[in-house]
Curated annotation (Swiss-Prot):
Molecular function GO labels: ATP binding; DNA binding; DNA topoisomerase type II (double strand cut, ATP-hydrolyzing) activity
Function of the molecule: Relaxes both positive and negative superturns and exhibits a strong decatenase activity.
Family: Belongs to the TOP6B family.
Protein name stated in the entry: Type 2 DNA topoisomerase 6 subunit B
Complex formation: Homodimer. Heterotetramer of two Top6A and two Top6B chains.
Annotated GO biological process: DNA topological change
Length: 602
């Protein structure tokens, strides 16, 4: 029996157990291949401070699919290309403690392995760094016996990008479009949580989808931190003791852990029964166990949070507004917390009404900016949504279910160590601290929605009064104008004056294919109004005296002061389309506004 045992490589293991990495069925396999390549592209661009411009194409080749993913990132040096794409468990972030999309060095090489298993075709990688004149091309397989790359072709070629990486894979699978679990939906949700990225996707039938960049602001890259004493396990501690360069146990504590200074080190040593002069490399399992027990008895400051990279409230709200065109949107980023020594934070966005027509709430789940498309029912983020009493916030809900409303709920969990339920990283485990933080964030956006709905109800009552005035006033105005032989009056403006509103009017004229847009703001309230006026547009915008931000989608912003009975006029030129139905205003209550909508996000 013993003669039958032999060592197998990690590549051989995943060759026989590819379902562990997300390749459990043909449709899911194509999504996973695209996901791994796009995640790599986003990480590379962000680390280099480059606004991501990612191109994805899927085409049918005989009875399988060719997948091409191309980015404008920093590129990969030639000597690193074979190991990055042809060796499992080869990566740059495995030993770092910081937020990142991938960490183990398995993702993209597993996609290469899946391609060669299902079609027998090698991966083609083209990459160029900024200091190179020509791109490097490498065609390779993975030797599963050795877990090493096998290069079958390499060379140089001209490439149109100054830097970047392109990977081509041919895989077996099924391409689907009209469902939640699809490549299209994955890329759409990726664009929502990465508003700084532009993603172009060409489908097998030639359909071109462009997910535009909403902001030019690149997220601040997270920093690496040392382990926190409350997040360490016995085996890891033993390994750290053996490999440290520290010559004494006291120096080991201070140099190898975060939040351990002289005073804390003394406290830990006293509780563990050590002097601090011990040699770390000579300490055994029992010594490590004493040290670990002392860690658990000691209060440490939470780990620093600059190892996390949140999306931010404004960016989440702006992204939801651009993608779904709701009537209400609000986002919240909770302060970082810790579970088992691992920093994490929760962000939640809620979009309601407007162009959202679905009866059931759409839930978008993310972990470290990656969409979670599968296992929604078994995910802690879903459980947190179901545990909130949404009836209190104006939605319909059956107990223990997602609420029913024309709404989108976005949840983003960022952490140095996402507690996934499996290796395929499809759902989050039920960690009490994470569920509690998610509930608090959901309740906060719920309260904001309730306030909005109550204001909307008051406004509807006021509108009824307006309608009554609106029915009578035109008849009176018409008769008066006929008698006095005057031009017809602006009824909306007169109603706004009677009701005491801040009235906004948008006038659009077409001149030689260019929209000339004039916005007139009239203050019929009793107080001065300091407001911000917004228009969201796609196309080329020229606006004197306004701030224009973004590319692809542009936000035009005016800061205005309007005194009682004063009228202010602004204008801009647009070669494109206006996204928002009515002008958006910040700085005035909704029940005092007519002709525009209140900007409902922080």
């Amino acid at each position: 029996m013993s003669g039958k045992h032999r060592e197998i490589s990690v590549a051989e293991f995943f060759e026989k157990n590819k379902h562990i990495l997300g390749y459990s069925n043909p449709a899911k396999a194509i999504i996973t291949v695209v996901k791994e390549a796009v995640d790599n592209a986003l990480d590379a661009c962000e680390e280099a401070g480059i606004l991501p411009d990612i191109f994805v194409r899927i085409s049918k080749v005989d009875d399988h699919f060719k997948i091409v993913v191309e980015d404008n990132g920093p590129g990969i040096p030639r000597e690193q290309i074979p190991k990055v794409f042809g060796k499992l468990l080869y990566g740059s972030r495995f030993h770092e403690i910081r937020q990142s999309r991938g960490q183990q060095g398995i993702g993209i090489s597993a996609a290469v392995l899946y391609a060669q298993l299902t079609t027998g075709k090698p991966a083609t990688v083209i990459s160029k760094t900024p200091d190179e004149d020509r791109a490097k091309k490498v065609v390779l397989y993975i030797n599963t016996k050795k877990n090493e790359p096998e290069i079958v072709e390499e060379g140089e070629e001209e490439w149109y990008l100054p830097s970047g990486t392109k990977i081509e894979l041919e895989v077996a699978g099924n391409y689907v479009r009209e469902r939640k679990q699809s490549v299209y939906e994955y890329l759409r949700e990726t664009s929502v949580i990465n508003p700084h990225a532009k993603i172009t996707f060409v489908e097998p039938d030639g359909t071109i989808n462009e997910f535009k960049r909403v902001t030019d602001d690149i997220p601040q890259p997270p920093k690496s931190i040392k382990p926190h004493p409350h997040g360490i396990e016995l085996g890891t501690l033993m390994s750290m003791l053996k490999s440290t360069r520290a010559t004494t146990l006291r120096r080991f504590l201070k140099e190898e852990f975060v939040r351990v200074g002289e005073k804390i080190a003394d406290d830990v040593l006293r509780k563990a029964g050590f002097s601090g002069d011990e040699t770390p490399q000579e300490m055994g399992r029992d010594d490590a166990a004493k040290l670990l027990n002392a860690f658990r008895q000691t209060d440490f400051l939470p780990p620093p949070t600059d190892c996390l990279s949140p999306i931010g409230e404004a960016m989440i709200a702006k992204s939801l507004m651009a993608e779904f065109q709701p009537e209400f949107v609000y986002a919240v980023t909770r302060k970082p917390k810790v579970y088992s020594g691992h920093p994490f934070l929760v962000e939640v966005g809620l979009a309601y009404g407007g162009e959202i027509k679905s009866e059931k709430v759409t839930l978008l789940r993310y972990a470290n900016k990656i969409p979670l498309l599968y296992q929604q029912g078994g995910c802690a983020l879903t459980k947190a949504v179901e545990s909130v009493n949404w009836k209190s916030y104006g939605m319909v809900q059956n107990r223990g279910e997602l609420p029913s409303a024309p709404a989108v709920i976005l949840i983003h969990l960022a952490s140095t160590n996402i507690p996934y339920t499996s290796e395929s990283k499809e759902s989050v485990a039920a960690i009490p601290e994470i569920i509690d933080e998610t509930r608090l964030a959901l309740q906060e956006v719920g309260r904001r929605l309730k306030e909005y709905l109550e204001r909307k109800s008051r406004q509807q009552k006021k509108k009824k009064k307006e309608e009554m005035i609106g029915k009578v006033l035109p008849l009176i105005a018409k008769k008066v104008c006929e008698i006095l032989e005057k031009e017809p009056l602006e009824i909306d403006r007169i109603v706004a004056r009677i009701m005491g509103y801040l009235h906004v009017e948008r006038i659009v004229e077409e001149r030689d294919g260019v929209k000339v847009v004039t916005i007139r703001v009239s203050n019929f309230t009793r107080s001065k109004k300091s407001i911000k006026l917004y228009e969201m547009c796609s196309g080329n915008v020229e606006a004197d005296g306004a701030k224009v931000s973004g590319s692809g989608y542009s936000t035009v912003t005016w800061s205005l002061e309007v005194k009682p009975d004063e009228e202010v006029e602004v204008s801009y030129r647009l070669k494109g389309r206006i996204i928002n139905k009515n002008p958006l205003v910040e700085g005035v209550e909704e029940d005092l506004l007519s002709g525009a909508e209140v900007m409902n996000f922080a």
